[in-house]
A protein has these predicted regions:
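Residue-level signal for well-ordered alpha-helical scaffold segments within enzymatic catalytic domains
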Residues: 1, 5, 55, 59, ...
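Non-catalytic, well-ordered alpha-helical scaffold segments
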Residues: 1, 51-54, 129-132, 199-203
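A non-catalytic, helix-rich entry segment at domain boundaries
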Residues: 2-83
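A residue-level signal for conserved active-site and pocket-lining positions in enzyme catalytic cores
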Residues: 3, 53, 100, 134, ...
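Metal-dependent nuclease catalytic regions and adjoining charged, substrate-binding loops involved
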Residues: 19, 122-124, 137-217
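Short amphipathic alpha-helical segments and their helix-coil junctions
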Residues: 36, 110, 114-116, 181-189
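Short helix-to-loop capping/linker segments positioned immediately adjacent to catalytic or ligand/cofactor-binding
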Residues: 40-44, 61-63, 86-89, 118-122, ...
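Non-catalytic protein-protein interaction segments used by genome-maintenance enzymes to assemble
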Residues: 72-141
Length: 217
C-alpha cells in the first residue's frame, strides 16, 4: 500500500518523502488488515510488523532510482487469450494486476514487487509464467513490446535489503511454454482431471474444503 501511494503520487508529478509514505502506510494499515481478515498474536506482534513494513518501504525508496517515471501503477488488466503462434482464440481472458510499469531508456519496464525472508538470486523459471503473463497483457493492451521485466525484492532481514533483478523481454519460447501450460490446464478442465496440488493458492480456492478433501479418498 505504501509503495502504491508513492508511485501514484509520482505519476501525478508529486514525490512523497519516505516519512509521508510510512505515515500513509500506517493510516491504511487498519482498513487493509480488516479487509484481508488478518489477525495477530498480540498488539506487540502487530506493532513489530508495522515497523518492519515501514523499514522496508524506507529502504526501498532510498534504493529506487530518483528519476524513475511510472507509466502505470497497480493496474488491473484483462485481455483475450490468443495463441500468438497460431492466432487461435482460446475462449477465455487473461486477468491480472500489474504492480508497476516504468519508463526506461529503451521503453517500458514491467516490475513486480516481492517480499522474501532472505537475500538470493531468484530462479527465473519460478517467475517465468507470471512475467510472461504480464508481458502478454502489456503487449495486447499497448500494442508495444516491453523493454524488460523486473522482480523487485524487499528482503526482510534485520537490516532491510532491496534487490532488483532484471529479465529480458519475452521471446517466442516463453510464449510457447506459457500457452502450452494454459492449454494443458484447459484440457484438464474439459476432461474433468483435477489433480491434487496443494500450495499457498489453496487459501484463495473455493474448493479447498470440498472437492479437494474428496480427491483420491
Amino acid at each position: 500500500a505504501g509503495l502504491e501511494q508513492f508511485y501514484r503520487h509520482r505519476h501525478l508529478g508529486v514525490t512523497l518523502e519516505a516519512t509521508d509514505v510510512c505515515r500513509r502506510l500506517l493510516e491504511l494499515w487498519g482498513p487493509t488488515i480488516d479487509a484481508e481478515g488478518m489477525t495477530f498474536e498480540s498488539a506487540e506482534a502487530e506493532c513489530a510488523l508495522q515497523q518492519q513494513a515501514a523499514g522496508l518501504v524506507t529502504a526501498y525508496l532510498a534504493h529506487a532510482p530518483a528519476d524513475e517515471k511510472p507509466l502505470a501503477v497497480e493496474v488491473a488488466t484483462q485481455a483475450q487469450l490468443f495463441d500468438p503462434m497460431t492466432g487461435e482464440d482460446l475462449g477465455i481472458p487473461l486477468v491480472g494486476i500489474i504492480d508497476l510499469i516504468v519508463g526506461g531508456q529503451d521503453g517500458a519496464v514491467i516490475a513486480d514487487f516481492k517480499t522474501s525472508a532472505r537475500s538470493s538470486e531468484p530462479l527465473e523459471i519460478f517467475h517465468e509464467l507470471q512475467l510472461t503473463s504480464y508481458s502478454y497483457l502489456f503487449r495486447q493492451l499497448s500494442g508495444k513490446t516491453e523493454a524488460g521485466l523486473e522482480i523487485r525484492s524487499l528482503v526482510k532481514t534485520k537490516t532491510p535489503k532491496i534487490e532488483f533483478h532484471g529479465y529480458p523481454a519475452r521471446t517466442d519460447v516463453h510464449f510457447r511454454r506459457f500457452f502450452a501450460v494454459v492449454r494443458e490446464y484447459l484440457d484438464a478442465l474439459d476432461a474433468g482431471r483435477f489433480n491434487y496440488r496443494p500450495g499457498f493458492h489453496c487459501g484463495m480456492c473455493d474448493f479447498a474444503t470440498s472437492h479437494c478433501r474428496e480427491w483420491g479418498a
